[in-house]
Amino acid sequence: MNAFQWKIAIAAVLSLPTLAAAGTTQTCNDNILKGQYVLAASGFTRPAASGPGTPWVPKAILEVLNFNGDGTLTTPGVTIANPFGDTGAVLDAPVGAPGDYSISEDCSGTLRFHDINSVTYKIFVKPPLGDTIWLIQTNPANNVFQGSATRVY
């Protein structure tokens, strides 16, 4: 083997770990979310059917979510600050609405609560363990709301 062939052989051997890593893609599905998570989110809201120029007011939520690993979830506790606009109210409901979720192989998905407003979030799950979820609310309209949920057990 001449010097050029040795260089090619060494370069090929050194690049094998990189090629192996490139072939291992992270995949997700519904069972990546199991256990109890705490969601902290904030943003802005305004009354339903508000027209242009209607002021936005702050809103925040702290919520406990129990993911069952099968596409369903329950909400054993929720506290919402200023949920209905500029009232300043803080609601501490004993339980929130149940819901469902769907996670794609690329770790993106949706989460929907079975409440009167069908509150829905676009989500992204942190692979490989699913211990963090990033969320942005997509329904109902007149909400700009985002946050993250962290597995606590």
What are these regions (language model features)?
Residues 1-10:
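Bacterial N-terminal signal peptides that target proteins for export
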Residues 9-18:
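Bacterial N-terminal signal peptides
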